Amino acid sequence: MIGKKNVVFGFLFLVLTAALGPLMVLKYQDWGAANGQRGQVVGYLQQLKAGEYLENPETLEDLSAKQLSVANAEAILAMNKLAATEQQIDFIKGGPHAHGNLEALLNIVVGIALCFIAAPVRLKQLASWLFILGSITHAGLLYLERVFMLPWANMLVSTGIGPVMILLGLLLMGVLAIKGFQGEPVKDYP
């Protein structure tokens, strides 16, 4: 069964990429703190605006230009911190987590489909390896780059070889399925 390695790889790869979910949850704690801080300082600015920036709402004293600029700076920094925290989560979510889960499931489906396709073994092996290597050189390298912060992985990802392999695998699977899809598992002969 040529597709077996894709099914096994798919489930193991899914464990790795799905495990990024709890990592992102841990980063949401930082997001919660940053969002709370932003709420406080922006709320203070809203109070100042309601008073037309003339007096401090807590002390009712006249507001100096320095106090107003400090309040603005604190609000800007708090919003920047919140955006940076969100960017860390999105950096993982939009890359290795989403693509990894998708490519893991794609390998599982391809592995099962290969069991039902009567075609030359070399072509089935080619399709199988295109999906495995495509997943490793796309989502796998995104994982290394974004989770372990290895910059060399980004250089390899940017070549686009991983997605190209997956697209070629999809094309090959489509052609093989047109000609050889059976309603029951097939036996492969070398």
Give the positions of each predicted feature.
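Polytopic transmembrane helical bundles with strong interfacial aromatic enrichment
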Residues: 2-90, 94, 108-148, 157-190
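Divalent metal-coordination and catalytic microenvironments
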Residues: 97-98
